[in-house]
Amino acid sequence: MANCSTLVTENSVYNNLLQDKQTTTTNGKYSEVPGFPKIFTFSVGKPLWNKLRYHILVMENLGPDLHQLFHQRKKHFSIKTILMLASQFLTRIEFLHKEGYIHRDIKPANFLMGIGKNKHVVYLADFGLAKRNKEIYNERTKFEGTAHYASLNTHLGISQSRRDDMESIGYVLMEFLSGSQPWDKRNKKTKKRL
């Protein structure tokens, strides 16, 4: 189950990011922005017996994420598939960056395939760690994201910006091309140095 504060952040990003781009249809659902899940509702419930509030974010049903697909295919995608994925990754992240946000958790599990007529559309999801891009340089920033795909600057504690999302996309594509990351095959001593 997702951390409640990340669901609040995710809902806020969806609202701000897609506010002018989604329109309500006659059945009350939002029309989609290509490559971003439709959000149907977000709700904060009353405190439960443990005095914690529950948060609910309801979005459209999507297909498998790229982490699942990559492993189902024995860690092999064709070059053509990787190029098509790269094109859609860059389109999604360009939209996100133009809207003034950075994702901060780019990884295969946060890219999902559509279903039905959208089965070839890659969706970018999980905005629980996203934030407004302020381009403020800081060397004492708390680590946010997934270590395996995080940029070098993120590991060094430098505040994240658009470049870090792009570097993470590069690591994802490198893994799709070779089946692993370069640091997957190194010993613990070398990994620590990296």
Q: Which residues make up each language-model segment?
A:
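Catalytic-loop of the protein kinase fold
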Residues: H97-I115
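Conserved structural core of kinase catalytic domains
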Residues: K29-S78
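Conserved C-lobe activation region of Hanks-type protein kinase-like domains
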Residues: T154-L194
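ATP-binding glycine-rich loop module of kinase domains
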Residues: M1-N16
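Conserved activation segment of eukaryotic-like protein kinases, specifically the C-terminal portion
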Residues: N138-T154
